[in-house]
Structure formats: structure tokens, C-alpha cells
Design a protein with these regions (language model features):
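Short acidic, Gly/Pro-enriched loop/turn segments at secondary-structure junctions
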Residues: 301-308
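Short clusters of hydrophobic/aromatic residues that line enzyme substrate/ligand-binding pockets
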Residues: 286, 313, 337, 371, ...
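Substrate-binding/charge-relay-adjacent region of secreted/lumenal peptidase catalytic domains
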Residues: 1-9, 14, 19-297, 324-325, ...
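Long, low-complexity intrinsically disordered segments that are proline/alanine-rich
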Residues: 470-486
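Exposed, interaction-prone regions of secreted/extracellular proteins
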Residues: 318, 334, 472-475
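An often Trp-containing, charged/polar helix-loop segment at the C-terminal end
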Residues: 299, 343-348, 395-449, 457, ...
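Phosphate/diphosphate-binding glycine-rich loops and adjacent basic-rich segments that engage nucleotide
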Residues: 309-319
């Protein structure tokens, strides 16, 4: 066994060795296994460490290379060639209709409707997390990005920096998700640097990517904002994406972002309360992590100057079916910052936990953003994937305007006056995020598990962050699952 790298800030030691040495070091037996997508390596028996090390090791990752069942939350994967500008009246369970005159918008238009402060994000770096999924590798074609920026109003090309992780690079082919992240964030904050981190689909790749984003070293970019438009599976204890020890490692990294004054925005999902189960409501991870700001979805329509209607996003039965993700975490307790709001018990179990999302924004494909994918004509794309980078652009403006990073947002968000948000009541329009056969949660006054606190009044948020002084790290409960080596 050979030590390849040690990093105190990342709390990691990377070692390499032949299978026999690994088996002996951790008292396991490495084997190859078959599953529906091929073969993977894993081990028989629990990982065991010498007694003099066990108390100091939080997790052992990399013994298993099965790909995490990740999803990107963009409607790009379900394009149907729908005519542009067509009014939408999608109907289905929980989806009464869209607002009148719902049409594709641009990120700049939505930023104006949400009263974002003036600014361009100069001097800020937005880190965009991109990863390989079972749909293929992540990537973008610069020609598609340039064409999309023209379609969105002849906007300048974003300042893009590619950051490979574990040897994974831009595939060079537009996957829809990566381009949406780039163009939405780049439209709102045109002078911010857009750092694209490309990760593989294994647990160790996810951890290595987060370490690189949160604890940069050498020539790594230094992001003040991180946007994640992916889900790594439901956060239920016992689900296969991560072991308890891996969960502890990942949420520990997110906790580090608060100390490092990095704002983390995560999409809440595009299938309502349904994540993996076809019958029970779940929340998506990492949106449910207590150290991130989870972003749900709305539909905007009937725009007339600064006036507009905004509904819960639930387009079941429409050309681009989808609904805002949200619910109650099965893994994380109610954090201190959410004690001021009423979080319903988890559907089906009655369990109490962290509520998702925290805020929301324009997500419906029907009011979405034009995207050029593979050189084809522009088509509107939506999803909560469009919300996280939108608010990443807002935070780049705010950080640049205030001259300092805002850092962890949630402690501030839940202490702000109601006027800081546009409350999405659920009537008229969809009143819940039920999806398929899964019963979801109802929208209503104040925080709800469809749209959180609502869409954000950007100028009001900047004023609140400006008067609050430097960001303060607020306490939040650790996950319920205890950490143990895997």
C-alpha cells in the first residue's frame, strides 16, 4: 500500500495498492458483482480498521465503484419539439393549469421580475458541479453555448474554466444540463468566472469533487458560490446510494462551506415528492442537507411589465411533465433555522425532519429558457436545474456589490420579513407536488414543501445581507445516522 496524497483541510488520505493488500489492510474480500447496468467492484464483510486508527477515520471510500444512481434535474432530456411561445394549460393530478400567457422567458427577464440588484458578478467565481450519470457523461459544446447566449438576447459568452476531477473532463457533447447551468448563471452574472467541475459517477468521485470545490489547492479556482443541479438519490436511511459513513463525509464537507463562506444552492428535483419510490414521498439528496439552500420550482406567466403571476410548478399531463421537488427529510432533523416555520409530518410515515425546499424560482419548461443542444434550433428547457444557477447568479451579484461573500444563507433567509419573498400559495394553479401515484405536500401561506419560502426579492436579500455584517455560521443538527467506516 502506498500513500499517494494527504490533505489536512480535506481531511483525506489517498492510498493505492493491489487487491490482496487492500483485502488485508481492511479485512475484506474484494469481488466483482453484476447488476442491471453491468459489473462493479465491492467487498464482502464490513471494513475493519486497526484500533489505533478506528477513532480517527470517518469513512473508507473507493472499495466500491458502483455508480451512484444520480439524476440531473433538467427537462432537456424530455424535449418533445413543442412549438415555441405556445400557451400552456397542462393538466393532471395536482396540476390545474399554468398562468395565462405562459411563454418562454430569459434569465435576464426573470432576474428583473425578481428584483435582482444591478450588477454583473465581477470578481466572483461560481462553481458548477457536473457529473456522469446513467444517461452519459457531462459536457458542453462551446458553439452551443454561444448560440444559446445569442438566443437569450445576444448576451456575451460566459467566462468558462473547466476543472477535471479524477481524470474526468468535458465530453465536448452538449448534455442539456451543463449548458443550462452555464447559460443561466452566465446570463445573470456575465462577469463572474464560471468554473465547471466534471466528476465521475462513483461515490469517491463525488467526494473528491466536493473537496476540490470547497478546499481548493494550487491552481484550483476558488468559488464563493456552488450550484448543484443533480440529485444523488433519496436521503432515506438504508437507500443504496451512500453508506452512513459516506453520508457523514459528504455532509461534513457541506458544513465546511459555512466555515469557508461559500453559498451552496441545490436543485430540489423535478418529479414532485417522488424520487425513487413509486408509492412513498421522499426528498432528494443533497437538496435535503441542512448546510445547503434547496431550490424548488415555480411557473411564471401573464407577464406585464413588472407584474406577473407565479404558480407552483406541477405540469403533470403537459408536454414537459414535471413538478417541484420537496418534502420532509428522513435523515436530517429539523435544523435550528427552520424552527420558525411549520413543517408538516412526512407523508406516509408521520416522521418529522428538515423541510425541503428553502426557496423557489422559475422552473417550468413552459416558462423556461431557450437552449441550443447539438446545433438544433433553440427549444425551451426548464427544471429546478434552472433555479440553482439563477440564484447562483444573484449571489454573485450580491457578493460583488457587498465586497464580501455571503456564505451560508439559510440562517438569514428564515429570519427575514415575509416581504422578502413572493409567497406561492397554490391557488389558483397547482396546489401540491403530488406526482404519479405518490401523494405529495400542499402549498399554502408561508413556508411549504412545494416552494419553500417562495421566490426571492433580490434587492431585499442584498439589503438584509448588507445590514447583517459578515456571515455568521449557524448551528444545525447532524444527520440522524451515525458515522461508521464502510
Amino acid at each position: 500500500m502506498k500513500v499517494m496524497e494527504t490533505d489536512a483541510a480535506r481531511r483525506s488520505v489517498i492510498i493505492r495498492g493491489p487487491a490482496d493488500a487492500v483485502n488485508k489492510a481492511f479485512n475484506v474480500q474484494l469481488n466483482d458483482y453484476e447488476y442491471e447496468r453491468g459489473t462493479y467492484r465491492s467487498h464482502d464483510g464490513p471494513v475493519q480498521l486497526p484500533s489505533n486508527l478506528a477513532d480517527y477515520v470517518e469513512a473508507v471510500v473507493g472499495l466500491t465503484n458502483r455508480q451512484v444512481h444520480a439524476q440531473h434535474f433538467s427537462t432537456a432530456r424530455r424535449h418533445g419539439g413543442r412549438a415555441l411561445g405556445k400557451e400552456s394549460n397542462a393538466k393532471g393530478r395536482g396540476a390545474a393549469k399554468d398562468p395565462a400567457n405562459t411563454r418562454p422567458l430569459t434569465p435576464v427577464q426573470v432576474a428583473a421580475l425578481y428584483n435582482f440588484p444591478a450588477g454583473d458578478g465581477a470578481g466572483q467565481t461560481i462553481g458548477l458541479y457536473e457529473m456522469e450519470t446513467n444517461e452519459g457523461p457531462a459536457g458542453y459544446d462551446p458553439a452551443d453555448i454561444a448560440a444559446t447566449m445569442r438566443a437569450l438576447g445576444n448576451l456575451p459568452m460566459p467566462q468558462i474554466v473547466d476543472v477535471p476531477v479524477d481524470g474526468v473532463e468535458n465530453s465536448g457533447q452538449s448534455d442539456g444540463e451543463t449548458g443550462l447551468d452555464i447559460t443561466v448563471a452566465g446570463a445573470v452574472a456575465p462577469k463572474a468566472k464560471i468554473a465547471l467541475y466534471f466528476a465521475g459517477g462513483e461515490t469517491q468521485n463525488i467526494i473528491h469533487c466536493l473537496q476540490k470545490m470547497i478546499h481548493p489547492s494550487g491552481n484550483d479556482p476558488v468559488p464563493s458560490i456552488i450550484s448543484i443541479s443533480y440529485g444523488w438519490g433519496p436521503d432515506d436511511t438504508g437507500t443504496p446510494s451512500f453508506s452512513d459513513a459516506e453520508f457523514a463525509q459528504i455532509t461534513g464537507l457541506f458544513e465546511d462551506t459555512a466555515t469557508n463562506k461559500i453559498t451552496v444552492l441545490v436543485s430540489s428535483g423535478d418529479s414532485g415528492a417522488q424520487i425513487a419510490s413509486r408509492t412513498q414521498a421522499q426528498t432528494s439528496y443533497p437538496a435535503s442537507d441542512v448546510w445547503v439552500t434547496a431550490c424548488g420550482g415555480t411557473t411564471i406567466g401573464n407577464v406585464n411589465g413588472s407584474s406577473f403571476d407565479e404558480y407552483v410548478w406541477n405540469d403533470i399531463g403537459g408536454a414537459g411533465p414535471g413538478a417541484t421537488g420537496g418534502g420532509v427529510s428522513a435523515r436530517f432533523q429539523v435544523p435550528d433555522y427552520q424552527e420558525s416555520v411549520t413543517i408538516p409530518p412526512r407523508v406516509h410515515t408521520g416522521q418529522h425532519g428538515r423541510g425541503v425546499p428553502d426557496i423557489s424560482g422559475n422552473a417550468s419548461e413552459n416558462s423556461g429558457y431557450l437552449q441550443v443542444i447539438g446545433g438544433r434550433p433553440p427549444e425551451p428547457v426548464g427544471g429546478t436545474s434552472a433555479v440553482a444557477p439563477l440564484y447562483a447568479g444573484l449571489m454573485a451579484r450580491i457578493n460583488a456589490n457587498l465586497g464580501r461573500p455571503a456564505g451560508f444563507l439559510n440562517s438569514t433567509l428564515y429570519g427575514l420579513p415575509a416581504a422578502t419573498f413572493r409567497d406561492i400559495l397554490g391557488a389558483p394553479g397547482p396546489a401540491n407536488n403530488s406526482f404519479g401515484r405518490v401523494q405529495g405536500y400542499n402549498a399554502g401561506t408561508g413556508w411549504d414543501a412545494c416552494t419553500g419560502l417562495g421566490s426571492v426579492h433580490g434587492q431585499a436579500l442584498q439589503a438584509a445581507l448588507g445590514s447583517a455584517g459578515p456571515a455568521v455560521v449557524a448551528a444545525a443538527p447532524a444527520p440522524k445516522a451515525s458515522a461508521a467506516a464502510d
